[in-house]
Amino acid sequence: MAIELEDLGLSPDVADVMQRLARVGAGIARIISRNGLERDLGAGVGTNAGGDGQKALDVIADDAFRAALEGSAVAYYASEEQDEVVTLGEGSLALAIDPLDGSSNIDVNVSIGTIFSIFPAAAGPEASFLRPGTEQIAGGYIIYGPQCALVCSFGQGVQHWVLDLDAGIFRRMPDIRPLPAETSEFAINASNYRHWPQPIRAFVDDLVAGAEGPRGKNFNMRWIASLVAETHRILMRGGVFLYPGDERKGYERGRLRHVYECAPIAFLIANVGGGATDGCADILTALPDRLHARTPFVFGCASKVARVAAYHDLACEETSALFGSRGLFRS
């Protein structure tokens, strides 16, 4: 046994897949803890299907998860590191995975993770994944940080496990609590301010204005450049995350993958009462048009996610009036 799954009512096939994912996750945690002692896990080794640079650990993780799922109920394996869906067999399930999220942080000892999503297998490989996120059986992640933890939803709340290093087992913890209605934290890469669309600038400017601004309170900004780490913080204490599309070539639809990253995170957030959109529309009801499709992504406390969408609904003149001559880097 690699993870405690009692009393969750999972089908034998899903429970078996979770055991396999947990077993690989525990192994990857051990590999990460020895980075630099035997090999450089952050060394560049090529590019993936989306054109992003691959690190050694990206490939190690992808190979490990793929191998572990052979012989399971997973018929189709879709990975951010693979060009196409890999057919593993004739099982009843399909699994999408970002084997190693946040790999730019490998060499600086910042939390990284694995994001995964389980669907019922459809009639063919791509059809199993180009579908609404509401059809997920499970969505979750493993975070490799000061603790190695696994967080997953099967559609009823969000469950939480922590890796017991001595036993090599993910121990069940109390479920994640519903997200708070209000928050004083937001996460966005402010260095891209000049490229953002006006509604995003307006929203952030109003937060930065603090107690004297239209929100009437002070906010703190966070940015880790690891989606798993950002998600874990928001699940633990609330907040809102924004990765908008912007004016730069290749960033028009943001940089996060709909299938491998955004759909499973949105599934988690929805199951603790939060919201997840592309800035305007619900991520979970959207249909990706290709495996490696990207999407802008806003998620977290429902009220803040709804407010971002409201800023997009305003005409440009109205949005400008909200913050007048203010800007993130102007008084």
Swiss-Prot record:
It is found in: Cytoplasm. CDD domains: FBPase. Its cofactor is Mg(2+). Binds 2 magnesium ions per subunit. Fructose-1,6-bisphosphatase II is not light-activated. Its EC number is 3.1.3.11. InterPro entries: FBPase_C_dom, FBPase_class-1, FBPase_N, FBPtase, Fructose_bisphosphatase_AS. It holds the Pfam family FBPase_C. It catalyses: beta-D-fructose 1,6-bisphosphate + H2O = beta-D-fructose 6-phosphate + phosphate. PANTHER family: FRUCTOSE-1,6-BISPHOSPHATASE-RELATED (PTHR11556), SEDOHEPTULOSE-1,7-BISPHOSPHATASE, CHLOROPLASTIC (PTHR11556:SF35). There are two genes for FBPase in R.sphaeroides. Belongs to the FBPase class 1 family. Homotetramer. This is Fructose-1,6-bisphosphatase class 1 2. The gene is fbp2.
